[in-house]
């Protein structure tokens, strides 16, 4: 029986130069594996707690030495000797050890690092790829990437309200071809921005961060880039948005669109989305309304839920109990999956299973503060999520996930790429 022999954590850096945790697990056969925990910029109120030191003399208060110490002492002490391949049991022990609903004591960053490293170590010890260990024989589907090629909102220092303008390469036979087409659109977009004397600096997730006069102009130029790159707009490559509306809303559920110089209530904002969807091939909108605006979400879901994918990120924060409430109220039809929002791999699996049981689409997702760790690439294939958000085709911490997916596709001798089937049910 494989057991946990040792656990330790180290403070390392993420892609934004902020500290994060690298957790390592050593098993009884001396197999060792590590995992680096990501961190978000725009976070939902109900996310599990990311423990920071708040010591202003180090990293402007963002150090994670306390979380590392929790791994190196409390967590290590209670997990050594447990069966390594009993992921659910170990994760439940972590939850009980913390004793709070949101990991306020140990820190979700401490807990997730150990949970990820354990899964990776167990897979390695059994000589299995991580996707096969977590997903079994049915792990065959390569996810459709949602590539964030223009950044706004909290991910960039510019005048665009919407946080992410994405492309989705749907009309392709393989992940490799879909990724190639996306890269070509990205490079074509850069040329178009250069021609307009627009900034081609990149945001946290590798997308460009130009200054536009309103929130529609990015849709126009991305549409041009798709066609100029030689692809059919809508048919081969579609558009998607992450509005991150919780960043735009006030206490009265009015949404402040600086790009349009407008203040809209929920119904007016939904009407605005309907105009955009009618004019552009937008197939997905994430966080179209605030995480607290459940009445607005119900209206959005009624108006657009049969037509496009409506993704809850801040709305559901990868939390099964919150998702269950959304299911009961017919809110949204898809959920973003971010393991660090909930705390452990097992809890993430629970949320994915609930979503799939109720025909909610799952979108595996990175965070804006990432690293070279490619865990979510394997995780997306393991659970056949069908979609993944992991940035543009720039910045090595984003490319690490794409390169891992290319490796997996090769190992699976192509696997299944469901781009053409993804939205046919709509």
From Swiss-Prot:
Record note on cofactor: Binds a second Mg(2+) ion via substrate during catalysis.
Reactions the enzyme catalyzes: (2R)-2-phosphoglycerate = phosphoenolpyruvate + H2O
Alphabetized GO MF terms: magnesium ion binding; phosphopyruvate hydratase activity
SMART domains: Enolase_C, Enolase_N
Cofactor: Mg(2+)
Binding-site positions, Mg(2+): 242, 286, 313
GO cellular component: cell surface; extracellular region; phosphopyruvate hydratase complex
Protein's UniProt keywords contain Cytoplasm: yes
Record's keyword terms, sorted: Cytoplasm, Glycolysis, Lyase, Magnesium, Metal-binding, Secreted
Location within or outside the cell: Cytoplasm; Secreted; Cell surface
GO biological process: glycolytic process
Record's protein name: Enolase
Biological source species: Helicobacter pylori (strain G27)
Source lineage: Bacteria, Pseudomonadati, Campylobacterota, Epsilonproteobacteria, Campylobacterales
Gene: eno
């Amino acid at each position: 029986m494989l057991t946990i022999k040792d656990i330790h954590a180290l403070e390392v850096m993420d892609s934004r130069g902020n500290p994060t945790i690298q957790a390592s697990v050593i098993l009884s056969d001396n197999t060792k594996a590590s995992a680096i925990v990501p961190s978000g910029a725009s976070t939902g109120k109900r996310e599990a707690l990311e423990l920071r030191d708040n010591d202003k003399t180090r990293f402007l208060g963002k150090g994670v030495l306390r979380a590392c110490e929790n791994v190196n002492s409390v967590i290590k002490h209670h997990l050594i000797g447990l069966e390594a391949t009993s992921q659910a049991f170990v994760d439940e022990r972590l939850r009980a050890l913390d004793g709070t609903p949101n990991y306020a004591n140990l820190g979700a960053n401490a807990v997730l690092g150990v949970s990820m490293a354990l899964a990776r170590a167990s897979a390695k010890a059994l000589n299995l790829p991580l996707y096969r260990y977590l997903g079994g024989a049915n792990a065959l589907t390569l996810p459709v990437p949602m590539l964030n090629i223009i950044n706004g909102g909290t991910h960039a220092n510019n005048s665009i309200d919407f946080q992410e303008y994405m492309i989705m390469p749907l009309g392709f036979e393989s992940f490799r071809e879909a990724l190639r087409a996306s890269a070509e659109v990205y490079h074509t977009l850069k040329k178009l921005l250069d021609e307009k004397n627009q900034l081609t600096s990149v945001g946290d997730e590798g997308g460009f961060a130009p200054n536009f006069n309103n929130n529609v102009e990015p849709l126009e130029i991305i549409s041009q880039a798709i066609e100029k790159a030689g692809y059919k707009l809508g048919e081969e490559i579609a558009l998607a948005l992450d509005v991150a509306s919780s960043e735009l809303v006030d206490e009265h559920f009015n949404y402040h669109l600086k790009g349009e110089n407008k203040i809209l209530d929920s119904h007016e904002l939904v009407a605005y989305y309907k105009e955009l969807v009618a004019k552009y091939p937008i197939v997905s909108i994430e966080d179209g309304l605030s995480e607290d605006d459940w009445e607005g979400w119900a209206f959005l879901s009624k108006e657009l839920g049969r037509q496009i994918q409506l993704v809850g990120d801040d709305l559901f924060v990868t939390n099964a109990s919150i998702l269950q409430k959304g299911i009961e109220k017919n809110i949204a039809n898809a959920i973003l999956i971010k393991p660090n929002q909930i705390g452990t791999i097992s809890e993430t699996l629970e949320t994915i299973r609930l979503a799939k049981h109720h025909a909610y689409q799952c979108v595996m997702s990175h965070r804006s503060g990432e690293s070279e760790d490619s865990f979510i690439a394997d995780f997306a294939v393991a659970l056949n999520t069908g979609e993944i958000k992991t940035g543009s085709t720039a910045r090595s911490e984003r490319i690490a996930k794409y390169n891992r997916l290319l490796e997996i596709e090769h190992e699976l001798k192509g696997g299944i790429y469901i781009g053409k089937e993804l939205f046919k049910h709509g």
